[in-house]
Design a protein with these regions (language model features):
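N-terminal amphipathic/basic-hydrophobic helices that include classical n-h-c signal peptides
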Residues: 1-29
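NTP/phosphate- and nucleic-acid-binding module
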Residues: 16-17, 27-542
Length: 542
């Protein structure tokens, strides 16, 4: 294979090029559980995510972001922030405090209603969310049905009629009847908040503890998820306050300040990125469910009566934002809520196909005027909006979009992690992170640590580092350095060789295809920018 540039020919037989070309894109065979464990280990090994307080044996469900993880996280946040505030002239930002007046959480309903139904297995001493146990059971039934459908499709080929198959196949009908019965009981129990029925469903379905394998369950109990602490100089004079369980309330209590000082007219939105805290009794699946996490929320204030139209628009808008990353539209789906939260009249989740199944990535809710009306009631302050066009005052309705930053990080990492079988039998580990949000955009690699190559490499680095997060690496063979960059998701590697001193050209290697081309040093910035600039993603959203 040859690469031509400026009348010169560079052969892949030259030792400084990566000598391994794809035989095929075959991923190593692993179960989803095995893949997830490998991913967690990879995140630690390459500086993405560490267990918090590890030298003290860690703290359950609390994680720290390393040097690669914080770059990825910041890039995701920038993508969201710019999509919200730059592409929408009627959406502005805010940064509210974690500590707020405790009455805020009474008004929002969190003090009385922010609970999870939990159940313990007496043999393993492990605690679980009862609703999640039932939902996972229903998910397994769905998997059985889908497997039967897949078998039918394989058997009948092009003549396969899925609708007819689902309506007539005895195995599908049997599983569907089982699903419908359990699902209807579950929905009724949710609406009635019937904790005894939760347990009865678990017993009737013979749902066992994953650890002990037994059905020896306690009764289901409700646990409030808010962390409380004290504010004051002495314990006697201290007031109980809460670490915020969501960022939304900081927007609601400030919405009128923003509206007046920004001369905002309805419809308008307020965006915020910030930490939230929930005392998750059952925290698991790595950074998917943590006790300290980060949210990206936007509250969109609208005229009452228009909420369902705006709800539909924001559903479409948010799904487009996700799919725009290029991680496959088939990996996303909407899941409408059957049991609505106390503040909502419509709600849906955007779910992503994680290694452990489709799970919530973002929530979109029509919150009506619940929050603003309650804050007006509890504070005694009028916080209505005066509409100059209709000359009337009213309490706006709100459409909320809420996404977990940590879940987005996990979605990107779990989708991007690949182990590829190469022609020489070796396995290449690569993170095919979308280039605009990759932690490192380019690595500058001198072929050897002498003959003036490091000096030229540093010259290139000093020009690129103003525009991109770059790395310099001169240790080990060029092949090993390529592998290190593949493992952290660097889209481009720039190899500086002896010919570079004369022709001022370098070898640019693409992460995903491993193809290489000879390019002038003066063209590097524009070539890389065309692939990794975040604005490329944003333009697709217009």
């Amino acid at each position: 294979m040859k690469y031509a540039a400026h009348s010169r020919t560079y052969s892949t037989n030259n030792y400084y090029f990566c000598p391994i070309i794809y035989k095929s894109t075959n991923y190593c065979t692993m179960t989803q559980d095995e893949l997830f464990k490998v991913l967690v280990a990879h995140c630690k090994e390459y500086g993405f995510i560490f267990p918090s307080s590890e030298i003290y044996d860690g703290l359950a469900a609390v994680y720290d972001y390393g040097q690669m993880g914080v770059e990825l996280k910041n890039n995701i946040k920038q993508y969201w922030w710019n999509a919200m505030t730059r592409l929408n002239g009627n959406i502005v930002g805010i940064d509210s405090c974690i500590f707020m007046h405790p009455r805020i959480w009474e008004a929002s309903g969190h003090v009385s209603a922010f609970n999870d139904p939990l159940i313990d297995n007496k043999d393993s001493k492990k605690r679980y969310r009862a609703d999640v146990l039932i939902e996972d059971y229903l998910g397994k039934i769905e998997e059985k049905i889908n497997k039967e459908v897949a078998k039918g499709r394989k058997k009948f080929g092009d003549s396969f009629d899925e609708e007819q198959f689902r309506a007539t196949n005895p195995n599908v009908l049997r599983e569907k009847a089982k699903y419908d019965e359990v699902h209807s009981r579950y929905v009724a129990a949710e609406k009635a908040n019937d904790l005894a029925e939760y347990k009865q469903i678990i017993l009737d379905c013979n749902i066992v503890c994953p650890i002990s394998g037994t059905c020896n369950w306690t009764d289901v109990r409700q646990f409030n998820l808010m962390f409380s602490t004290s504010m004051g100089s002495t314990s006697e004079g201290a007031n109980t306050i809460y670490l915020r369980p969501e960022t939304a309330q900081g927007i609601f209590v400030n919405y009128l300040n923003v509206q007046k000082t920004g001369r905002m007219k309805i419809p308008f939105g307020i965006a915020q990125i910030g930490k939230a805290f929930r005392n998750e009794i059952v925290a698991r699946q790595f950074i998917f469910r943590m006790r300290e996490f980060e949210q990206m929320e936007m509250q969109f204030f609208i005229k009452p009566g228009t909420e369902l139209d705006w709800f539909a628009k924001w559903k479409e808008n948010r799904m487009k934002w996700h799919v725009n990353l290029g991680m496959g539209a088939e990996n996303y789906r909407f899941h409408d809520h059957e049991k609505l939260a106390h503040y909502a009249n419509a709600a849906t989740d955007i779910e992503f196909q994680f290694p452990f199944g489709f799970k919530e990535l973002e929530g979109i809710h029509s919150r009506t005027d619940f929050d603003l009306s309650n804050h007006q009631k509890f504070s005694g302050k009028k916080i209505q909006y005066f509409d100059p066009e209709t000359n009337e005052s009213y309490t706006p309705y709100v459409i909320e979009t809420s996404i977990g930053v940590d879940r987005m990080v996990l979605a990107v990492l779990s989708h991007s992690y690949k182990e590829e079988q190469l022609e020489n039998g070796e396995t290449r580990v690569v993170l095919s992170i979308p280039a605009p949000i990759a932690p490192v955009k380019a690595a500058v690699l001198p072929l050897v640590k002498k003959d003036g190559l490091p000096e030229l490499a540093h010259e290139i680095l000093s020009e690129l580092e103003f525009d991109f997060n770059c790395q310099y690496d001169e240790k080990d063979s060029i092949g090993k350095r390529y592998r290190r960059q593949d493992a952290i998701g660097t889209p481009y590697c720039i190899t500086v060789d002896h010919d570079s001193l004369n022709d001022r050209c370098v070898t640019l290697r693409d992460r995903d295809s491993m193809t290489q081309e000879r390019v002038p040093i003066d063209s590097l910035r524009s070539i890389i920018d065309s692939k990794v600039n975040l604005n490329n993603l944003l333009r697709n959203l217009k």
